[in-house]
Amino acid sequence: MSTGQLKRFKGCEYLTHRLVLATLSGTPIRVEGIYPDEADPGVKDYQVSFLRLLEKLTNGSVIEISYTGTSFIYRPGNIIGGRVVHDCPTTKGIGYFLEPILILCLFAKTPTSLTLTGVTSSNEDIGVDVLRTSVLPSLQKRFQVGDELELRILKRGSAPGGGGEVNFLCPVIKESLPPIRLSEFGRVFRIRGIASSTRVSPAFANRLVESARGVLNPFIPDVFIYTDVRRGDECGNSPGYSITLVAETNKGCSYAAEHCGEAGETPEDVGSFCAKKLLEVIESGGCVDPYTQPSTLTGMLLSSEDVNTIVVGQLGITSQLVVFLRDVKALFNCEYRFKELESGQVEMSCLGKGYLNVNRRIQ
């Protein structure tokens, strides 16, 4: 159960990560000023849904939402994990709910089997393909948790109807996370990707592949993009298509980019836009891309009591990062040190807290 004094926050930017940090630290929080000036003020359906998901993953959590919905109190309980099924609203992608809790489930009482339903690919939120092909392999390598950390895409669901389904499997860790030291990002030596479609012609996926390769092949010959065409019971009711690209370096780093087709966009537009987006991320440099950065920074915070260091590109320095660092300072009393390098990248370092899994079952 949560202990300590109630911490107050204003605004709901990066709310999901704030709630996860509060759960890990066991600190009760009060969040105020949630969309107070909008025509429809107060917490949105997807924010309430994330609170309910945390309630399912924990035991003893208490959530109190004000009458107007512009503020709420969250008192975190113990992280228990286990088998959980959650239906995500179609206003947000599944990645909005899954990405923040990747670290949380490592510190549960029992291994987690989480089934989420909803929209699998969205331009507003991280897609499940990026999580499966870029973020999770990075966490497996740096946190030494092995292949038990897995994400299965059972059904694909495009916006606005959703209907997708994924299953996330996560083990529990017995010791502190190892320190993270990433200073060299190396050179890109290959690019892999997935072009997916739901309830449209299979030719759409092939057109995505050809347009992306047309942009990337002049820079690197080793480009291979898989196609995943879903129809019938393998997907939701909405037609759609998307592409995810992951560039791997000879130092074990990866950069990802994704894009979903919207109204008026052809598969050629989507494929070439995503490829150019990937080139921008590669040019920015750093050892982690913006998708992997939140989980990596949280892992640095929770790692054994040693110095952690990573290098991030300019694309990783955002307003959301500032909010995250303020929340870390408020909830863990920990600070990150910044050092700008001659190359234009930024070196971030912090001292790990030596966080232990006090929830796990003693065997």
Swiss-Prot record:
One GO molecular-function entry: RNA endonuclease activity
Protein family membership: Belongs to the RNA 3'-terminal cyclase family. Type 2 subfamily.
Alphabetical list of PANTHER family matching this protein: RNA 3' TERMINAL PHOSPHATE CYCLASE (PTHR11096), RNA 3'-TERMINAL PHOSPHATE CYCLASE-LIKE PROTEIN (PTHR11096:SF1)
UniProt keywords, alphabetically: Nucleus, Ribosome biogenesis
Pfam families xrefs: RTC, RTC_insert
Name of the protein in its database record: rRNA processing protein rcl1
Listed GO CC annotations: nucleolus
Function per UniProt: Does not have cyclase activity. Plays a role in 40S-ribosomal-subunit biogenesis in the early pre-rRNA processing steps at sites A0, A1 and A2 that are required for proper maturation of the 18S RNA. Rcl1 activates bms1 by promoting GDP/GTP exchange.
Main localization (coarse): nucleus
Subcellular location per the Swiss-Prot or TrEMBL entry: Nucleus, Nucleolus
Subunit structure: Interacts directly with bms1 and the U3 snoRNA to form a stable subcomplex. Component of the 90S small subunit processome also known as 90S pre-ribosome that consists of the 35S pre-rRNA, early-associating ribosomal proteins most of which are part of the small ribosomal subunit, the U3 snoRNA and associated proteins.
Gene3D superfamilies named among the record's database cross-references: RNA 3'-terminal phosphate cyclase domain, RNA 3'-terminal phosphate cyclase, insert domain
An annotated GO BP: endonucleolytic cleavage of tricistronic rRNA transcript (SSU-rRNA, 5.8S rRNA, LSU-rRNA)
Species this protein is from: Schizosaccharomyces pombe (strain 972 / ATCC 24843)
